A protein has these predicted regions:
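Transmembrane-lumen/periplasm boundary regions of multi-pass, lipid-linked membrane glycan transferases
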Residues: 37-41, 159, 184, 219-223, ...
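Membrane-embedded architecture of ER/inner-membrane glycosylation machinery
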Residues: 215, 349-380, 384-544, 556-565, ...
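Transmembrane signal-anchor helices characteristic of membrane glycosylation enzymes that use polyprenol
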Residues: 2-32, 265-282
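Membrane-interface transmembrane helices that cradle and orient dolichyl/undecaprenyl
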Residues: 112-113, 118-138, 177-214, 224, ...
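Loop-to-helix entry region of an early transmembrane alpha helix in multi-pass inner-membrane enzymes
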Residues: 64, 68, 77-97, 160-164, ...
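Short acidic/glycine- and proline-prone juxtamembrane loop motifs at membrane-interface regions
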Residues: 159-170, 386
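Extracytosolic helix-loop segments that constitute the early lumenal/periplasmic catalytic or substrate-binding loops
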Residues: 16-20, 34-58, 65, 72, ...
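Transmembrane-helix motifs of polytopic, lipid-linked glycan transferases
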Residues: 86-115, 119-126, 176
Length: 626
């Protein structure tokens, strides 16, 4: 792995996560604005608990740590989307740095130290797919950096770690016990011994985490629970327990009992930290009903019946959950599938007994497999299954890909590069349509369009470079990260000052209420909250339903204008003026990206014309006499 290429990839990854962080359209969880609303209302209430919300039966949807984080960040950063999302990015980079450290500290990953530890040299595939034996030329730190970059290249990391409704904190806190355990193993090895060898003192206590670390890590696990849910103590503690067990060549029953006692104590401490919510909240009954019952217990119920849902072929079945890690990888899904195929081939390889495979397995690989197994098995049990639930184990997937990087067949990387190429072409088309060039919509300037097209060309070159046998792997990684940067560049004009509503002057708008009430569209739970980051300061967004449940057309607009000081109204791209004129006047206009498309709205025959389904105009309107 060329170090210069790694540095370029690291710069692309950092740029992808930082650039456009405050954007309205970055990949995120659809419920992000719901949680931003709860955080804002709680901050406005002047107290930390109970949580506050104007949304019906939507208050204690998550433990308070996520909202407290937003309250602190909002106070420091002026309640901007950038401020709310920045802590998640810090957590993400911390996980990536810790992962790089773990892999680099573990071993050089060369020859028999790599992979399954069966004494086989690394295998690199040539362009035709045949393998030739080659000792890995990766330095430990290069392999560690590679693991971090692969983790950042997963789409689940970009989407669910970067947004305010983030998975980054629990990923960090639930990974910490595993990382600290391997640090403790490294501290106990001799100067010349392998990093994972057990110290000469093989007493029960030497084979288990130290008591101080158990207490501190138990408190850390509690912080992770306070971000997401008490139920996650099951996979977090079980993964820690199994990783410690799998990292040792042998553990007697005394050590096993002591390990179970220590992990159990840490779990109790973590649950105690989470339980402080019930102690500190003035409304513990509301916490129980809204969070424990409504948010958690319902995941074990299903109207179709548990087994009917579990064995079905839809997205919530056991079969789909088995592909959760590949789904979370996004554009790198083919590489994850290639890793899985290689693992299955080794498991069923003839003439090697299972016990031999297990005892010869390197502790680093055993760590990752135990980590992945626990999270996957745990989240096949609830009736509501989703690839999102195993996101805290994605660092283990990145670890395995980095370890087996030279051995995964080159064709899997080429498939990822091909997906990145398709994504770059589509994004380039969107950038072209947005631009002033060739009669586009004029949303972006020529300079912004040229920048996006140049980045798309760079991604295309990187993807095509994957055809070279020695460059296919790094080219795939660069092309995937390049797509993320390209996405930021394409979205940049949608978040510029020119794309936002300007405050109307007194000659065009005389507010009737204080603060003036603005009716804004709400096509999903809590989405109207985003207009607090779009409208000028001092205007109060009031949601109205859009879609099948709402009044449509001119009559619906007139009703809204009669009931509010002003209205934000969305119309098709080809509409040059609002349909309420001359009974209304325009306070502002901007372009928006449409989401939650209806069935049949996006088709193969119109995929190349995004102006037909991706864009809309939003008009800020008031009554003509206002």
């Amino acid at each position: 792995m060329n170090r210069t290429v790694l540095v370029i990839a690291a710069c692309l990854a950092a740029l992808a996560y930082v650039w456009g962080l405050g954007g309205q359209y970055i990949p995120s969880n659809g419920d992000e604005m719901v949680y931003a609303h709860i955080a804002r209302k709680t901050a406005e209430s002047g107290h930390w608990l109970p949580l506050a919300s104007d949304l019906f039966e939507t208050r204690n949807t998550k433990p308070p740590m996520l909202f407290w984080q937003a309250m602190v960040a909002g106070d420091l950063g002026g309640w901007s989307l950038t401020a709310l999302r920045t802590p998640g990015v810090f957590y993400t980079f911390a996980v990536a740095a810790a992962l790089a450290w773990l892999v680099a500290r573990s071993s050089g990953l060369t020859g028999h130290d790599a992979g399954l530890g069966l004494g086989q040299p690394s295998i690199t595939q040539n362009a035709q797919g045949s393998g030739h034996r080659q000792a890995s030329a990766h330095s430990p730190w290069a392999t560690g950096l590679l693991a971090a970059l692969v983790f950042l290249a997963f789409f689940s990391t970009l989407r669910y770690h970067r947004a305010y409704l983030t998975s980054a904190p629990e990923t960090f806190w639930f990974s910490l016990p595993i990382l600290v355990w391997f640090w403790q193993l490294g501290q106990r090895t001799s100067h010349h011994g392998a990093i994972f060898s057990i110290a000469d003192n093989t007493s029960s206590s030497a084979l288990t985490p130290s008591w101080p670390s158990v207490v501190l890590l138990g408190l850390g696990l509690g912080i992770g629970l306070a971000y997401k849910s008490f139920a996650l103590i099951a996979p977090a503690a079980a993964a820690w327990w199994l990783v410690v067990l799998a990292s040792q060549p042998w553990m007697g029953w005394r050590a096993l009992m002591l390990l179970s006692l220590k992990v159990g104590l840490a779990a109790l401490l973590a649950l105690g930290v989470f339980g402080l919510w019930f102690v500190l909240d003035p409304d513990p009954a509301g916490v129980w009903q809204e969070f424990i019952v409504a948010e958690n217990a319902k995941k074990f119920s299903d109207q179709r019946g548990y087994w009917a849902e579990a064995l079905s072929l839809n997205g919530s079945s056991i079969w789909s959950q088995l592909l959760a890690y590949a789904v979370n990888a996004g554009l790198l899904a083919p590489v994850v599938l290639g890793l899985m195929v290689m693992g299955l081939q080794h498991v069923f390889k003839p003439q090697i007994r299972f016990s031999q495979r297990f005892h010869a397995m390197s502790p680093l690989v055993a760590l990752a497999l135990a980590w992945l197994l626990v999270w996957l098995v745990t989240f096949t049990i609830p009736s509501q299954r989703s690839a999102r639930y195993v996101i805290p184990a994605m660092p283990a997937v990145a670890l395995l890909i980095a370890v087996y990087w030279p051995r995964i067949h080159a064709h899997w990387f080429r498939l990822s590069a091909l997906l990145a190429l398709v994504g770059a072409v589509l994004l380039a088309r969107v950038a072209w349509v947005m631009s002033e060039l060739s009669g586009g919509l004029g949303i972006s300037s020529s300079l912004e369009a040229v920048l996006a097209l140049a980045l798309a060309a760079g991604v295309a070159l990187a993807a095509l470079a994957s055809l070279h046998p020695r460059a296919c792997r790094t080219a795939a990684l660069l092309s995937v990260l390049g797509v993320y940067v390209l996405m930021d560049a394409v979205l940049m004009p949608m978040d510029s000052a020119q794309a936002q509503f300007a405050a109307p002057d007194s000659s065009t708008s005389v507010p009737i209420s204080t603060p003036p009430r603005v009716a804004v569209p709400n096509n999903f739970n809590g989405q109207y909250e985003r207009y607090r980051y779009i409208l000028p300061a001092g205007f109060q967004p009031q949601p109205y339903e859009v879609g099948a449940r709402a009044a449509q057309g001119k009559a619906g607009l007139e009703d809204l204008l009669a009931q509010h000081d002003s209205v934000v109204w969305s119309q098709d791209v080809n509409t040059s003026k609002p349909e309420c004129e001359p009974a209304c006047k325009v306070l502002g206009v901007r372009w928006v990206l449409k989401s939650r498309h209806l069935a049949g709205e996006v088709r193969l025959d119109n995929l190349w014309t995004p102006q037909d389904w991706l864009f809309a105009r939003e008009w800020w309107l008031s009554r003509a006499g206002a």
